Amino acid sequence: DPAMNARLATAVDKAKKDSVPRDVIERAIKKGAGTGDEKLIMEHVVFEGYAPHKVGVIVEVYTDNVNRTAPEVRVLFKKGQLGTAGSNKFLFDHVGLVEAHHADANIDREAAAIEAGANEFEPLTHEQNDDIPEGAAGARFICDRTAVHAVVKWLAANGWNVVTSELGYVPKQFPELTD
């Protein structure tokens, strides 16, 4: 039930934006839930590790075969180091991320974030996300994972065009990188 599962609701919203037919979405939900004709047990696996220069990385994967997927993910960490569960999750906040824009370039983004139920916001420009038109007020709203759907609904009802909504990891501290 997407109303009870924020991750599923986000995936369904993303599929609808990409014009995926309703029957395909419903079939994928049944397949992932292990019901219907095509039973498939999908497993959620989180890989944690460090890229070169000690940059923390978290990779979330849904797979029907962990034994096949794990070596493929290890290849991504070949110049870094694949860690164990919990090795770097403390470096990140697991949050909901909603990116949107409003035609009024002078709209109060902070007030919109508060009203929508987001914890924080960051201004976004066309250079940062090409889905945001030039001259529009763009913002990335950061909220609790369970509040993504409510934030999207409020923004859409108040004149914002939602570009993306997803669950993700935001670093608590950004590392300094050099060439």
What are these regions (language model features)?
Residues 99-179:
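Positively charged, low-complexity, intrinsically disordered RNA-binding extensions
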Residues 45-96:
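RNA pseudouridine synthases
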Residues 3-10, 19-24, 54, 68-72, ...:
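Charged, alpha-helix-enriched surfaces in structured cytosolic catalytic cores
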Residues 2, 22-24, 85-88, 163-165:
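Flexible, glycine/charged-enriched surface loops at secondary-structure junctions
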Residues 33-42, 81-87, 120:
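Active-site phosphate-binding and catalytic loops of NTP-dependent enzymes
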